[in-house]
């Protein structure tokens, strides 16, 4: 009874124009934007955003390459020609090009005020100036109490050192003139090297004693202590060498004894 009607067959309120003419694309009809699309898929009743945003400069290219998804510029803040259109989200040029409007990812460090920096640096500068302008006698008095205990402590440590009594160290006492206090050192009566037949490598004459005329002289006392330590080290090395030489002689004698015993029982020398 009723025939099937299409939406495009209805007339609009613009004076009898068809729906297809009313909803046609506002783009220039000279170029067919759907030429690259099959006719079965193309529908002139729909309007795409790209067709609405086409301007005259872009109509010089074919419809298939006018606006593509890969090569065309971005429609959002992509060209000054699009500034007249209200395109969502409508990012302006100033919003993207000015880095001052960007929010900081990390909290900004508060700079130190210049006045506070001057207040903090002023006492240090004043203290340095006072130290530089301090008279020389006051500096000597401020340094002397710290040096004097060091001298006394050094002399006491050298005199109380356990290595001092066993070495030839002579210290001239201040009130005894040229009298010398010499440590009692008794050299060993016999040497192990002479018994083992090893030649002695020590000095024929004893080393001269170490004399310190001024016990308050820190440099002289330190030099004497270093000399004593060096003599003790050389003495220990010499004794160790003599012990090793004696051990070698003992092993050689034992080897010769076992060798002669083996030869007496008919062992071959090869």
UniProtKB/Swiss-Prot annotation:
PANTHER family: ACTIVATING TRANSCRIPTION FACTOR ATF 4/5, CRYPTOCEPHAL, ISOFORM A. GO terms for molecular function: DNA-binding transcription factor activity, RNA polymerase II-specific; RNA polymerase II cis-regulatory region sequence-specific DNA binding. The lineage of its organism: Eukaryota, Fungi, Dikarya, Ascomycota, Pezizomycotina. Residues 222-240 are annotated as: Basic motif. In N.crassa grown under amino acid starvation conditions, this protein is required for increasing the transcription of the genes coding for many amino acid biosynthetic pathways enzymes. This transcription factor binds and recognize the DNA sequence: 5'-TGACTC-3'. The keyword Transmembrane helix does not apply. Binds DNA as a dimer. Residues 216-270 form the bZIP domain. This is Cross-pathway control protein 1. Residues 114-135, 153-213 are annotated as: Disordered. Keywords: Activator, Amino-acid biosynthesis, DNA-binding, Nucleus, Transcription, Transcription regulation. It comes from the Eukaryota. InterPro entries: bZIP, bZIP_sf. Residues 241-248 are annotated as: Leucine-zipper. Belongs to the bZIP family. GCN4 subfamily. GO terms for biological process: amino acid biosynthetic process; positive regulation of cellular response to amino acid starvation; positive regulation of transcription by RNA polymerase II. Its main location: nucleus. SUPFAM superfamilies: Leucine zipper domain (SSF57959). It is found in: Nucleus. One of its GO terms (cellular component) is transcription regulator complex.
